[in-house]
């Protein structure tokens, strides 16, 4: 996080929320671009710096976006910066545009679509395989994109490790909104630096009122996160299972409370007790179910 920008945010903070109109006026962000018409997501620019404002209709989701940013930091997962904000009509989240000059950005969806188009008509089952979005076929799609580079094996290994880390984080936080459109791969123009961009759109985490969209290797309309975890445990390599177990053990209630404290420090105020209580309740409910799945898996191992 840019400390100078954080200082500017805090100067415009009122009751934990940043007054967006005041911030834009004082810091001369006078260029605006509408990113999503339906949700009124806008990006504001000052020179080469951009901030994005996303209105939220649900107060819980507004707070969770910031809490998940702080939780991801504690787990050493690269996440876009989020804060609380409001304008004349709405409350919402402010984030900083992580895009830089001399870099290209591709959604995982773009890469999978290119892979499907390339192989269409050559393999009879390829479209069905690709649309399951399982880890094996994502590996194939990445191979199809990068195999011509000398260090393609290193690149693909790095990307797959990052993807599994994000996947485990989403499982543990019940993120209902991760999909191939908001998983972004960033490439330097000379292709010496290729990785996943910081994760974003985490407002539906630890939320049992939403239907999961995280359909990796399953039909999301028929399965839940716990079925997804069971399939992951039974079909993944030991290396990836170890990643999940390490994150599961690290993400305990004390870490969630640390993320809440970090959020309160960031916004210079206290989170509503109702929000904290709901978060902690959802954490324990989720933890208990995951514990059952892991125990069943251990029994199968024996």
Predicted region positions:
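Conserved kinase catalytic-core segment
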Residues: 60, 134-211
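ATP-dependent phospho-/nucleotidyl transfer catalytic cores
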Residues: 99-168, 278, 289, 298
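C-terminal catalytic region of ATP-dependent kinase domains
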Residues: 73, 189-302
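Conserved ATP-binding subdomain of kinase catalytic cores across diverse folds
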Residues: 3-126
